[in-house]
Amino acid sequence: TEESWKHCYDTFKGQGKIVMLNLLKYKPMADYTGMTVSNTQKDKTGKETYQYYLKQVEKIFENTKVGNILYYGESQDFLIGPQDEKWDAVILVEYASLDVFVDFVKSEAYQKVTGHRKASLEDSRLLPASNFNIQEVEK
């Protein structure tokens, strides 16, 4: 929502590097209904389509150096957390700053591929985080 973007911006503006934690729940099959996206992954699973999307994002990162995928892997049931909440995968993406992330999301290159993300996911969560300087944490 617009309110959550404003809160994120107010919280992380000027704090340097941020890491975005993504929790992903794939659709059984990709669904492009109502979307105009080139190179649709028709007859592909949500997981296959998300991985196609991720490869396109990696290409953007390689060309622009705006982000870095730190981790992408399958997830299982929570060890601590709601047992009825199920996620298929987790991805951690690092950006130099919140402004860099916002510029990336608004970029023409990203806008061309973001439909694949929407087509592939049943549900998702995006949680921004910034580093603590462990030396500055009170003991």
Each language-model region and where it sits:
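Short S/T/G/P-rich N-terminal loop/turn motif that feeds into the first structured element of a domain
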Residues: 1-88, 96, 100, 130-139
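A short local loop/turn or secondary-structure capping micro-motif enriched for an aromatic residue
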Residues: 78-79, 111-113
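Active-site-proximal segments of catalytic enzyme domains
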Residues: 91
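Conserved catalytic core of Hanks-type protein kinase domains
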Residues: 94-95, 104, 120
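Short amphipathic alpha-helices in soluble, non-transmembrane regions
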Residues: 103-110
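Charge-dense polyanion-binding interfaces
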Residues: 115-139
